[in-house]
């Protein structure tokens, strides 16, 4: 694939960028974009964010010297040009593939990836840690740069870091705000560009410092007057006053697609005393028309046709997400007290139709998972029926609020937890494999998982009207194709015995239930009679059924798409221990390690929670063999 690119095919690494002329750099930028489009059209991925930072990546590599100079990219959505232009040009076609390179930045993958991430708004905190660490080690000549998107600045953690950095005021510490939505009212005219060049120049900065040094002899009042005058004048033309108030030297906004302007400005700000915030504006999806026209859709996509931008869709049942979204709309039509909250996941959580139909009852709070949870708690306290839609991996960020603001007060918030279990290509930063463990230990919390589409609808209905903190978790991707109609309440804490057996019984939660049935069906043909139970409630468990099963079976196999540490299987063992019941219990689930990226079916097979893995576990258990 690389042979088609005149510049990129012979490109060796960041040192080449420092020697290219601007015409060559422009060609390189175009080739990098084309390469990203070609690879992501086959593999899927975060197209829009990466296409928007090609020139910025080139400028950073031209001005700075990583890995000695540390560059921290927020989340990693913008990381594809970085991977290509550092040391993964040849490996880029394996992007997001099993055993290939990650869709995010990973320290294990390259010396250029200073800090890994998959969740937003961590870059400034991490970069500040690098900066202070270098200062303490005497490495004061190195630079530390954080690159963060404007969307990530909706999260409180970013402002906590800005506030701390503004207080410490380290030198050679630069935060680059990649504004690809222009949500911070950029002023990008000729006057702003000219003034920006002046403000960032060495002469103005040196003169500014000399004036401050002189005024210090006359006390604080003249310095304060100077600062207020500066802020007033800059506030007329600049959106950066808030950053100045936090203690940063604000520069910008500048064109994030002008390599020379970026290079000149970066060189100018390198020696400004104290922390610098450089505001650059970019176009999400630049260079690919479909992505430019619909940046939300093209933030992250499945494989697509390059010519048309049409997403390649395989024939499959409805997704768990779409089943949830449709059910919530139906329930909201009946009950005006139902409201929906999401932290910047309207599309991903299946709430687009809800937002259209009930705009006054839909709240996208931005990347603010903690606020979303406590906001939902307040709505519940006022008598509404809030449904807070999270990805499992992001609910982790609101754990204190789940405990302190919802569960402790026993407020009826329904948590719709999408992307539970192994999510696939996005890998360990996005797998939702901890929620059963961290939720089942919380008092007052109901925790459940549906086996299929109809049960998802019924459990959602049950949760909304339960009057309790209620967590409903379901996986990413296509469901099983089970027909759906209506809603019915399910008694909380009840399980469902789907198949009676003799030799052993499988207790499965959520997605693995049908996998257990498939395994049992195959074993039945060989005369091995295995029971299967849909253990849909992880908390409270069906203790009555567990006692009954203990009278009929000696071997229990628990299956969950969650870590085995503290998960559903642990709960079964805890119950038997409390009751003094001695049984052999084998726990299948995600082992105590971070699972890599890859297709869901590959990963589920890897950890042994698909039909094949469950069948093997039964055979090993019945012959007394050890599970691996």
UniProtKB/Swiss-Prot annotation:
The gene is dxs. Keywords: Isoprene biosynthesis, Magnesium, Metal-binding, Thiamine biosynthesis, Thiamine pyrophosphate, Transferase. Pathway: Metabolic intermediate biosynthesis; 1-deoxy-D-xylulose 5-phosphate biosynthesis; 1-deoxy-D-xylulose 5-phosphate from D-glyceraldehyde 3-phosphate and pyruvate: step 1/1. Disulfide bonds: none annotated. PROSITE patterns: TRANSKETOLASE_1, TRANSKETOLASE_2. One of its GO terms (biological process) is isopentenyl diphosphate biosynthetic process, methylerythritol 4-phosphate pathway. Thiamine diphosphate binds at residues 77, 118-120, 151-152, 180, 288, 369. It comes from Aquifex aeolicus (strain VF5). Binds 1 Mg(2+) ion per subunit. Binds 1 thiamine pyrophosphate per subunit. The lineage of its organism: Bacteria, Pseudomonadati, Aquificota, Aquificia, Aquificales. GO terms for molecular function: 1-deoxy-D-xylulose-5-phosphate synthase activity; magnesium ion binding; thiamine pyrophosphate binding. This is 1-deoxy-D-xylulose-5-phosphate synthase.
